[in-house]
Amino acid sequence: NLYQFKNMIHCTVPNRSWWHFANYGCYCGRGGSGTPVDDLDRCCQIHDNCYGEAEKISGCWPYIKTYTYDSCQGTLTSCGAANNCAASVCDCDRVAANCFARAPYIDKNYNIDFNARCQ
């Protein structure tokens, strides 16, 4: 779920608050469209698509589904989720949080003009 995703982000990118990722580029935060502006935005596009795939599982709502995962030490290695939905959502979040840790954060891509740059 989004709360657990926030915690995963804090694990992998401890020097930056989760909300820095909530309004970044074309895909981090509110939906998404257009071409990702950079590698970090591409991480968010992949995460959005992953949630879309998880939603195809009957009764799976990624934004609120809880799951378990290994404790954090810089890299999140595995999800301990017990069912397909929880495992899928956890893996979406784990992959994205690790992707965020590898991708450079470019300040000018935070809070961009969505209508002008993301069509």
Curated annotation (Swiss-Prot):
Q: What is its EC number?
A: 3.1.1.4
The note describing how and how many cofactors are bound reads: Binds 1 Ca(2+) ion.
A GO molecular function held by the record? phospholipid binding
Protein's cellular compartments: Secreted
Give Gene Ontology CC terms.
extracellular region
Q: Does the keyword Transmembrane apply?
A: no
In this protein, the active site sits at: 47, 93
Task: Cite a single GO BP annotation.
Answer: arachidonate secretion
Please give the tissue specificity annotation from the record for this chain. Expressed by the venom gland.
Write the record's keywords in alphabetical order, separated by commas: Calcium, Disulfide bond, Hydrolase, Lipid degradation, Lipid metabolism, Metal-binding, Secreted
- Catalytic EC class: hydrolase
What InterPro entries does this protein map onto? PLipase_A2, PLipase_A2_Asp_AS, PLipase_A2_dom, PLipase_A2_dom_sf, PLipase_A2_His_AS
* SUPFAM superfamilies xrefs: Phospholipase A2, PLA2
- Disulfide bond keyword on record: yes
Say which family it is in.
Answer: Belongs to the phospholipase A2 family. Group I subfamily. D49 sub-subfamily.
What is the recorded function of this protein according to its Swiss-Prot or TrEMBL entry?
A: PLA2 catalyzes the calcium-dependent hydrolysis of the 2-acyl groups in 3-sn-phosphoglycerides.
Instruction: Tell me the protein's name.
Output: Acidic phospholipase A2 DE-III
* Source organism: Naja melanoleuca (Forest cobra)
